[in-house]
């Protein structure tokens, strides 16, 4: 592991200026942006609330779906005018999208005003690239094809002062046929337990109450370490860290979620009763084409085991509609599975062709109108399930970690239960950052309302 690498890259802390980071994509991207922000603040820069006033603009991109890429193109085009007015403006583009073959060159060709392009494997070197861009006055492209060892000691500028992401591993070895992630994030690499523990203890000192352990597939954690450490062992270890009050994790691949992990959640008091368990499809035939390594029966057996051991657990999921070759029968199997599991919530997506993935070349693509029709039906079923689960909370007193003011009503506070339910409630603002009791007075499809007691 490389430690305190940032200090060796760029020691000048007298930089003056502002920066703006726009992030698309998953929680891993969000944490990457927090690290970019941390590095910039470490050398003297400050956040700009408006990108029009920034000296540095960074777009941290996602390529999991086409829509995310289109947003990047549109937003990049809008920066041309800003660059014309302010030639000293530094524009950087990074993230998963840049790891795609030929993408960096295509971006520079279409948007020659971009100053810096870098990928997911070397974001820790951004201060160096920034320095070079200022001195050399020409575009810098630094996209590494292969991942290197994990870099520790990068400063992190976290958005929340209450809860934090803690990455425990990077990359993915699963190669689902629809997914670009293994190609742009590299192979699985686990952080040492001691490094994870150190980061969490530092968060506790700073007043954080909740952490979310992050990885593309957290259940594979530790397989590459010597000696090997299981994810369940890590969970039990983290549960013993004094001061942290809640521990979450995501994302779990169903094929790797062991009984030991289920027992750890059941037995460890700080582990939240919430599991995000992406099913992607309810059809065994489609799951095989997706290369998911489990079938419908396997998944349902796992869900039943989870519910048997953790009675009050909340289960959420991801579902893809319109995977190539999906028939009406396949889709109906997905609907029936959603009804049977009764998810607390679900992220639903239209299948998006990703160049470089095996599914891209499958000829039997589902027509767009059929995909949209199925998507609408799925959302209706999911929403009914969410509403049904939320109604169980009516008149109950639940513990809520107060995260801040409600986005929709400044007179209310907002937070989440250990089952990840969003609660907007009337309460004391002095309790922001604390866990309080809230009586639920109203249930909605996607949130709860209540009063602090």
Curated annotation (Swiss-Prot):
InterPro entries: Elp3/MiaA/NifB-like_rSAM, Methylthiotransferase, Methylthiotransferase_CS, Methylthiotransferase_N, Methylthiotransferase_N_sf, MiaB_methiolase, rSAM, rSAM_horseshoe. It catalyses: N(6)-dimethylallyladenosine(37) in tRNA + (sulfur carrier)-SH + AH2 + 2 S-adenosyl-L-methionine = 2-methylsulfanyl-N(6)-dimethylallyladenosine(37) in tRNA + (sulfur carrier)-H + 5'-deoxyadenosine + L-methionine + A + S-adenosyl-L-homocysteine + 2 H(+). Its cofactor is [4Fe-4S] cluster. It holds the Pfam family UPF0004. It is found in: Cytoplasm. Its EC number is 2.8.4.3. [4Fe-4S] cluster 1 binds at residues 26, 62, 96. [4Fe-4S] cluster 2 binds at residues 172, 176, 179. Residues 391-453 form the TRAM domain. Keywords: 4Fe-4S, Cytoplasm, Iron, Iron-sulfur, Metal-binding, S-adenosyl-L-methionine, Transferase, tRNA processing. Binds 2 [4Fe-4S] clusters. One cluster is coordinated with 3 cysteines and an exchangeable S-adenosyl-L-methionine. Belongs to the methylthiotransferase family. MiaB subfamily. This is tRNA-2-methylthio-N(6)-dimethylallyladenosine synthase. It comes from Clostridium tetani (strain Massachusetts / E88). The gene is miaB.
